[in-house]
Amino acid sequence: MDKRWSLQGMTALVTGGASGIGHAIVEELAGLGARIYVCDISETLLNQSLSEWEKKGFQVSGSICDVSSHSERETLMQTVSKMFDGKLNILVNNVGVVNPKPTIEYVAADFSFSISTNLESAYHLSQLSHPLLKASEFGSIIFISSVGGVVSMECGSIYSLTKGALNQLAKTLACEWARDGIRANSVAPNFIYTAMAQPFFKDADYEKSLVSRTPLGRAGEPNEVSSLVAFLCLPAASYITGQTICVDGGLTVNGFSYKPQA
C-alpha cells in the first residue's frame, strides 16, 4: 500500500471514543493501522468497545477520564506519553456536550460546564500534547466542531460559542505550530445519528425541518464524519491545515431555493 494512505506505525489519542462519532473515528484510524488510546467518561461503554476492538484485532487501549477535569487531563496525557514513548501523531478532540435552551435561561453552571467540557478540554489537551506531537515529526490535531459553530443552529448559544471557538483555535494552532510539524484542522458535522443527537430526532417536526434544509435530504451517519477525520490524519493530507470542513450534506451552503410542487 502507498504509505500516503496508511497510518501504520502511527499513534493516536481519541477523547470520547467509546460511542457515537468518536467510536467511528477509532474504528477508522485503527483500520488504517494506527495504535490508539481512547478515553471516555463511561466505564461501561469503554469496556464494551475495548472488547469489541480486541476481537477485531485493533490495537486500542484506554481508560476512564472526565475531560472537564484539569487534573484528569494531565493524568491522561502522562499515561499516553508513557504508552507511546513520548510521541503522538494524532490528537482527536472529540468530546462535547450540548444543552439546548434559550440564552436567557442559561445559568453560570451551564456556561462553566459547557466551556470546560467542549472548549477548555480541547485547548488544554492540545497544549499538553504539543511536545508529543512535535516529537513524532508528523503531528495532526483534529477538533470535532459542529455546523453550529459556522452558522446559527438551534443547539444553544453556549454550544455554538464553544464550537466556533474550536474552529478559530484550529486556525491559530495551524499557523503557530506549523514550524513544529503539527497540522490542525476542524471538522464540523451536521446533526449525525448518535445517542447525543437522539433528543433532536425525537421531535419529528424538527427532523423534518432539518432535512428540508439539507440538500442531500437526510442527517448523517458517524462513519461519514470519521472518514474525513481519518483522511486529514493521513500523509496524503500533509498540505491541509487550518481548515474548518463541514460534513453536513450541504446545509451550510444552502441558500433559498423554491421548488414548486409538480
UniProtKB/Swiss-Prot annotation:
Molecular function (Gene Ontology), one example: oxidoreductase activity
Top-level class of the enzyme under EC nomenclature: oxidoreductase
Listed Gene3D superfamilies: NAD(P)-binding Rossmann-like Domain
Family according to the record: Belongs to the short-chain dehydrogenases/reductases (SDR) family. SDR65C subfamily.
Record-listed NADP(+) binding positions: 13-37
Coiled coil stretches, renumbered: none
Transmembrane regions listed in the UniProt entry: none
Keyword NADP: yes
Binding site for substrate: 146
Assigned EC number: 1.1.1.-
Superkingdom as given in the UniProt entry: Eukaryota
PANTHER family in UniProt: 3-OXOACYL-[ACYL-CARRIER-PROTEIN] REDUCTASE, TROPINONE REDUCTASE
UniProt entry keywords in alphabetical sequence: NADP, Oxidoreductase
Active site, renumbered: 159
InterPro entries named among the record's database cross-references: NAD(P)-bd_dom_sf, SDR_fam, TR
Name assigned to this protein: Tropinone reductase homolog At2g30670
